[in-house]
């Protein structure tokens, strides 16, 4: 792929592009990343999915929380833009875990990089999914939905399912109102914190990034609901 993007840039120097690359491959090929930057790559999409190592293991992602953070820091150091995607709602996430995901996004200064729909994405379990082999899934799924082509599932904590519904409604309305990503992030955080605190969570405050936002506008897809 390197000769391809180099040749493309040589012939069409004003042309920009984006790529999709796994976190593990970004780590393995970090020496080649400046080539993307120098040949017009606007951003790199990567399916991060979660920042919880247990969940990443269940999803067999091939990277860890630390790997993701390492890649983001390297991107920031060399001037590349990360466009991370997540499966924020899955059968193993907790209110505290969801807040942790938001905190990591804020602390890594990625609020402008994350499309707000990513805060509401729910795991889809298809007919051939390897997740069906997990004992923790068996008790949560319902009969296969032929129309949707997925196995519907419910979270063990009904509050988490309700939070997902509330957040996707919030994101949809915010998109229609053309709200800024930082504003949407703050609203999502508040909704999540309202669920966390009644469950016994204490001592959490808003991420510093909400008050001292550093990130500038990040290149992004023209279709914000693309996942």
Where are these regions (language model features)?
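Short, electropositive alpha-helical surface patch
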Residues: 4-10, 94-111, 139-140
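Radical SAM enzyme core and accessory elements
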Residues: 130-227
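Structural recognition of alpha->loop->beta junctions
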Residues: 35-43, 102-121
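A structural motif corresponding to the C-terminal end of an alpha-helix
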Residues: 39, 70-82, 111-113, 163, ...
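Conserved SAM/AdoMet-binding glycine-rich loop
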Residues: 1-83, 90-93
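Glycine- and acidic
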Residues: 53-57, 83-87, 173, 204-206, ...
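C-terminal structural cap/anchor segments
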Residues: 71-75, 82-87, 96, 101-104, ...
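Flexible glycine/acidic-rich beta-alpha junction loops that bind and position SAM and/or redox cofactors
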Residues: 54, 58-59, 88-97, 111-153, ...
